[in-house]
C-alpha cells in the first residue's frame, strides 16, 4: 500500500491535526453493506464495524522473542512501566495501562489503547515513549500494528527454510520472519549464541519493487545484525529466478558445474492493496476511498500471487495477505490463483492456529460494484473506459467455491479485537504448476504464459550459460548498487585479522566480503551465511542485490603516537577493529586474551565520555585493574549487568573498546550509546 502523508483530525474535527476530515463516507458504507460482510450475524454487527473504523488505532508492539533477554525485558516492562501507566488521563480521557495481546505467542506483544501522537505528546506517557523509541532502535522491540504480526505467525518457519518476502518494505514482517527462524533453532540471539548459527541453514530474501522502499528495509535489518538476510529490488510480479549450485555430474574427465533454480520453502506475499482496512490510521482514506481502486490492483495482486506460487517448493507454504477488506483484492485473487494452478495448490485450514485470535471465514460470494455502486454480472457489462474488469473478479459457482474451501481464508475486522482490518490466506503447493494451463485473457491481460516448471528448470541452464560469458566476477556491476565481492581467505588483510584476534579455524573465513568493485578491503568487511554467498556468486548481474550481511571489521586509522607506543611495547596493533554490529557473532571464535571485564560504573563512564582518561575510572573498579594488561588497539569489553548492581535488567554486554596509551573509548555511535544507556540505566547519562 502506498504511503499516505496527509494529516487530518477526528470527529467532525479530526484527532491528530488541524485540517478537517469528516469520518464518514456513504459510498464506503453502501459498498460494504451490499457485500453483506457479516452474513448470519446480528444486524448491529455492521454498526459495530463502522464504529471502530472511526476510532483511533491503538499502539502495539512486540518484544523480539529470540533475543537472549526477551523475557527479562518483558518482566522489566511489566514491573517498571505498566504500574506507572495506571490512571493516566489525557485531555479528559482515561488511557488504560498496556495489556498483553492475548493471541500472540508467549505473551510478548502489547497493546496501548492510545495512538502514537498521544503517547508522544502526553507528559505521563513520556517515559513509555522513551522506552519504545530506545528499545525499537536497539532491535529489542518492534512497533508494529497488531494484525501486521499475523502473516509470519501463519508461515511456521523452520531454521533450514529459505524464505521469500515478496513485498517486504518497511520490513517489520521481514524482521519477524528471521526472529522466528532463530527462535525455532533455539538461538536466543544471533548476537549471543553465534556458535549455534551453524544450525540455521536458511535465509530470508526480502524484496521490494520500489528502490527507496527497499532501502527502508536496510534499517530494520541492521538492527537485527543477522547474517541470514538478503535484500533485493525487483517487481514482485516478475521476480527473476534465483540460481544456486546444482548437482555436478562428471563426464569422466571434467566436473560440469550446473545451476538450479532456487525454490522457496516459505513465501510471504503481503501485496500492495487499497488499504481500506487502515482507515483508523490513514484518515485521508475517508475522503479518498474508491471502489474502483480494487479493479486496478486485482491484476497486479494476482500476478504477484501466481509468481509466488511458481517460486514455491512443492510442499511449501505461501501466505497471501492484504490490509484491505475488499473481496476483489482478497477472495477473488485467491480463487483465481487456485483455479489457474489447476489443483496444484490448496488452501490450508488455520482455524485452530492462534486459538485466541478472533476471525471470520472467507466470503464465498460477493458483488462486483463500481464507485456508483452499480453491479456488474460480467466483464461484458462494463461500459466505463476508466475501469477494466476481468472474469477473475467474480466468485465461481457456489459448489466450486466450496470445493476450493475459500472459507479457510481469514478475515479480521476492527471491532473484533480493536485492530485494523486484515485478510490472510495460507496456501500449500502439493504439485508442480503446469503454467501452460494459464489463460491470460481469462485472468488478466498482462499475465505472461510460462512453460511448465519442469521444462523451465531444464531450459534455463542454457540461457544462464550464454549470459554468463559477458559477466564479471563481481556481483551486481550491472546495477547501481555497490557489488558484493568475496575476499580470498588468503588475502593479507584477512590473514592479519585472523592472526591478531586468534579467530578459531572452525569459523568460515571464506564468507567475508566487501562492497566495492576492486574486492580489496579498504574500509569495511562484512560476513553472511553460506547460502547468501552461493546466491551472490551464482546470480551476477541478474538479480539486483541491495543489502545484506553484518559488518564485522572496520579499518581504523592508527595515530603516530599509538604506533610509537606499540613499537616501544614490541606489540602489534591490528588496523582493523571489530565493529559493534558483528562483535557478538564473532566473539565465541576469538582468543580469550581480547576480552576484558568491567563493571556498570565503568560502563557508565565510557557511555558518558569520549576517550575517558584512565584516571577517571575508580581504583576499585575492574576496568582500571585490567587497563594495564589490555593491549593497545581494539579489545572487547565484557560487562555482566545485574539488577542487584543497579542495572534495570540482567544482561551480558559485549562491545568493542579501543585502548590508547592513557585512555580508552567505547566504539559505539552516539545513538547506540544513548540506547544502551536507556536500556541499562533508564536515562541518557
UniProtKB/Swiss-Prot annotation:
Cellular localization per UniProt: Nucleus
Cellular component, GO annotation: cytoplasm; nucleus
Catalytic residues (positions): 323 (nucleophile)
GO biological process: tRNA methylation; tRNA wobble base cytosine methylation
Signal peptide: none
Phenotypic consequence of gene deletion: Cells lacking both trm4a and trm4b show a mild resistance to calcium chloride.
The reaction(s) this protein catalyses: cytidine(49) in tRNA precursor + S-adenosyl-L-methionine = 5-methylcytidine(49) in tRNA precursor + S-adenosyl-L-homocysteine + H(+); cytidine(50) in tRNA + S-adenosyl-L-methionine = 5-methylcytidine(50) in tRNA + S-adenosyl-L-homocysteine + H(+); cytidine(60) in tRNA(Asp) + S-adenosyl-L-methionine = 5-methylcytidine(60) in tRNA(Asp) + S-adenosyl-L-homocysteine + H(+); cytidine(61) in tRNA(Asp) + S-adenosyl-L-methionine = 5-methylcytidine(61) in tRNA(Asp) + S-adenosyl-L-homocysteine + H(+)
Binding site for S-adenosyl-L-methionine: 167-173, 208, 235, 270
GO molecular function: mRNA (cytidine-5-)-methyltransferase activity; tRNA (cytidine-5-)-methyltransferase activity; tRNA binding
Chain's role: tRNA cytosine C(5)-methyltransferase that methylates cytosine to 5-methylcytosine (m5C) in tRNAs at position 49 and 50. Trm4a and trm4b methylate different sets of tRNAs. Also methylates cytosine to m5C at positions (60, 61 and 62) in tRNA(Asp).
Name by which UniProt lists this protein: Multisite-specific tRNA:(cytosine-C(5))-methyltransferase trm4b
Organism expressing this protein natively: Schizosaccharomyces pombe (strain 972 / ATCC 24843)
Native organism taxonomy: Eukaryota, Fungi, Dikarya, Ascomycota, Taphrinomycotina
Gene: trm4b
